[in-house]
């Protein structure tokens, strides 16, 4: 039995994760974490998630929770994820990170600490999105430089980072396939007399509104034709299922940094 703890247990994603763990054979929820000021501390994590009592109380004591845990799942914010990663290194525990918005410096810190323990870091745990990643690479390689690339992503009005980590990863995959530097090719804003589009640009547009779970479309636009690769998330359950699959896969792996492409055998 793989023992799993969830950080951000009282949040929307945390509830989905707890439910998915309960429904997955071979996994056991052994810890549920929230920040020290959370009004949900001391509550049964299963009742909070809406999946019935689990006799696991929500706590803010990360070190104590990790003592009884094999894998920690963290969908929070980069600063929190880094602190939790450091704790996992201290306790020699594995971690699945679904947080997005890491700076280059923060990402370098993740890379460094992943030399000590198994780490899954993925901007999107959805199987469908990761299939799209593979399709984007193949499409870019086939189409080459003759098609302009634009990316549009939509999310709910509570999302804090922009563009989404998934959209950035899509841009990176396309740029790599075309032999470009994503950081030099990405264009996040166009306004006024900004001049004609250059062939190297990868445009990135963001929409925020309502309760959109997540939608990403990559446009390959040529002369007289257009290809669109779109993924639409209907609920957060698919992200939770992917994260739980990652936790199951990660148990017993060698130290290193992995992503969903490793887990799905797409590399």
Swiss-Prot record:
<feature type="active site" description="Proton donor/acceptor">
    <location>
        <position position="155"/>
    </location>
</feature>
<dbReference type="InterPro" id="IPR023940">
    <property type="entry name" value="DHDPR_bac"/>
</dbReference>
<feature type="binding site">
    <location>
        <position position="34"/>
    </location>
    <ligand>
        <name>NAD(+)</name>
    </ligand>
</feature>
<dbReference type="GO" id="GO:0008839">
    <property type="term" value="F:4-hydroxy-tetrahydrodipicolinate reductase"/>
</dbReference>
<dbReference type="InterPro" id="IPR000846">
    <property type="entry name" value="DapB_N"/>
</dbReference>
<feature type="binding site">
    <location>
        <begin position="98"/>
        <end position="100"/>
    </location>
    <ligand>
        <name>NAD(+)</name>
    </ligand>
</feature>
<dbReference type="InterPro" id="IPR036291">
    <property type="entry name" value="NAD(P)-bd_dom_sf"/>
</dbReference>
<feature type="binding site">
    <location>
        <begin position="122"/>
        <end position="125"/>
    </location>
    <ligand>
        <name>NAD(+)</name>
    </ligand>
</feature>
<dbReference type="Pfam" id="PF05173">
    <property type="entry name" value="DapB_C"/>
</dbReference>
<dbReference type="GO" id="GO:0009089">
    <property type="term" value="P:lysine biosynthetic process via diaminopimelate"/>
</dbReference>
<keyword id="KW-0521">NADP</keyword>
<dbReference type="GO" id="GO:0016726">
    <property type="term" value="F:oxidoreductase activity, acting on CH or CH2 groups, NAD or NADP as acceptor"/>
</dbReference>
<feature type="binding site">
    <location>
        <begin position="165"/>
        <end position="166"/>
    </location>
    <ligand>
        <name>(S)-2,3,4,5-tetrahydrodipicolinate</name>
    </ligand>
</feature>
<dbReference type="Pfam" id="PF01113">
    <property type="entry name" value="DapB_N"/>
</dbReference>
<keyword id="KW-0457">Lysine biosynthesis</keyword>
<comment type="pathway">
    <text>Amino-acid biosynthesis; L-lysine biosynthesis via DAP pathway; (S)-tetrahydrodipicolinate from L-aspartate: step 4/4.</text>
</comment>
<dbReference type="GO" id="GO:0051287">
    <property type="term" value="F:NAD binding"/>
</dbReference>
<keyword id="KW-0963">Cytoplasm</keyword>
<keyword id="KW-0220">Diaminopimelate biosynthesis</keyword>
<feature type="binding site">
    <location>
        <position position="156"/>
    </location>
    <ligand>
        <name>(S)-2,3,4,5-tetrahydrodipicolinate</name>
    </ligand>
</feature>
<dbReference type="GO" id="GO:0019877">
    <property type="term" value="P:diaminopimelate biosynthetic process"/>
</dbReference>
<keyword id="KW-0560">Oxidoreductase</keyword>
<comment type="function">
    <text>Catalyzes the conversion of 4-hydroxy-tetrahydrodipicolinate (HTPA) to tetrahydrodipicolinate.</text>
</comment>
<feature type="active site" description="Proton donor">
    <location>
        <position position="159"/>
    </location>
</feature>
<dbReference type="InterPro" id="IPR022663">
    <property type="entry name" value="DapB_C"/>
</dbReference>
<dbReference type="InterPro" id="IPR022664">
    <property type="entry name" value="DapB_N_CS"/>
</dbReference>
<feature type="binding site">
    <location>
        <begin position="8"/>
        <end position="13"/>
    </location>
    <ligand>
        <name>NAD(+)</name>
    </ligand>
</feature>
<protein>
    <recommendedName>
        <fullName>4-hydroxy-tetrahydrodipicolinate reductase</fullName>
        <ecNumber>1.17.1.8</ecNumber>
    </recommendedName>
</protein>
<keyword id="KW-0520">NAD</keyword>
<comment type="similarity">
    <text>Belongs to the DapB family.</text>
</comment>
<keyword id="KW-0028">Amino-acid biosynthesis</keyword>
<dbReference type="GO" id="GO:0050661">
    <property type="term" value="F:NADP binding"/>
</dbReference>
<dbReference type="GO" id="GO:0005829">
    <property type="term" value="C:cytosol"/>
</dbReference>
């Amino acid at each position: 039995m793989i023992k799993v703890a969830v950080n951000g247990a009282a949040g929307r994603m945390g509830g989905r994760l707890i439910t998915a763990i309960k429904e997955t054979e071979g996994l056991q929820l052994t810890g549920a974490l929230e920040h020290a000021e959370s009004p949900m501390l001391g509550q049964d994590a299963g009742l909070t998630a809406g999946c019935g009592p689990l006799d696991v109380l929500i706590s803010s004591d990360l070190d104590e929770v990790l003592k009884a845990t094999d894998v920690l799942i963290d969908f929070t914010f980069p600063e929190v994820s880094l602190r939790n990663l450091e704790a996992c290194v201290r306790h020699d525990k594995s971690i699945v990170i679904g947080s997005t918005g890491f700076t280059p410096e923060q990402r370098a810190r993740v890379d460094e600490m992943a030399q000590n323990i198994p780490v899954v870091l993925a901007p999107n745990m959805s199987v469908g999105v990761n299939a799209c990643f593979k399709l984007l690479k193949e499409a870019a390689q086939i189409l080459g430089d003759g098609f302009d690339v634009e990316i549009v992503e939509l999310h709910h009005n509570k999302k804090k980072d922009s563009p989404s980590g998934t959209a950035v990863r899509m841009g990176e995959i396309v740029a790599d396939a075309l032999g470009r530097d994503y950081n030099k090719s990405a264009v996040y804003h166009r306004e006024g007399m900004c001049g004609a589009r250059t062939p190297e640009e990868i445009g990135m547009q963001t929409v925020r509104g309502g309760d959109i779970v997540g939608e990403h479309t990559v446009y390959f636009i040529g002369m007289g034709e257009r290809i669109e690769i779109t993924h639409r998330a209907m609920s957060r359950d698919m992200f939770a299922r992917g994260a739980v699959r990652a936790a199951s896969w990660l148990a017993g792996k060698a130290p290193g940094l992995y992503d969903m492409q490793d887990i799905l055998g797409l590399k």
